[in-house]
A protein has these predicted regions:
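Short acidic, hydrophobic short linear motifs in intrinsically disordered regions
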Residues: 22-31
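A short, conserved structural fragment
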Residues: 47-57
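Short amphipathic alpha-helical interface segments
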Residues: 8-22
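Amphipathic alpha-helical dimerization/coiled-coil segments
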Residues: 74-84
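Short helix-coil-helix linker/hinge
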Residues: 3-10, 66
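Basic, amphipathic "hinge/linker" alpha-helix immediately C-terminal to the N-terminal HTH DNA-binding motif
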Residues: 58-75
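Short amphipathic alpha-helical interaction segments
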Residues: 33-48
Length: 84
């Protein structure tokens, strides 16, 4: 099995958020096939770059993709298309 690059992980994380809408950390970690602690690191990275935003869903943190995150996801998918 081939290791995933950081860009693959970012793409999988953003695709999971896009599919599920407002998503909690557990759903994102399952969808992106990451341990929860690694998913938190990825979400912090994406949040610092304004690609996802953190919201409160009741008492829990949840994440939503920003328009900039959608553009970034589309760019990653375009690059993948040319690399495969």
């Amino acid at each position: 099995m081939e290791r995933r690059t950081r860009h693959d992980i970012y793409r999988d994380t953003l695709e999971t958020i896009r599919r599920t809408g407002l998503s909690g950390i557990t759903r994102i970690s399952y969808g992106a096939n990451l341990p929860v602690d690694r998913a938190r690191e990825v979400l912090t990275y994406l949040s610092e770059r304004n690609l996802v935003k953190e919201e409160l869903n009741g008492k829990r943190k949840a994440y939503r993709m920003t328009p900039r995150g959608g553009e970034f996801l589309q760019a990653l998918q375009t690059v993948d298309m040319y690399l495969d």
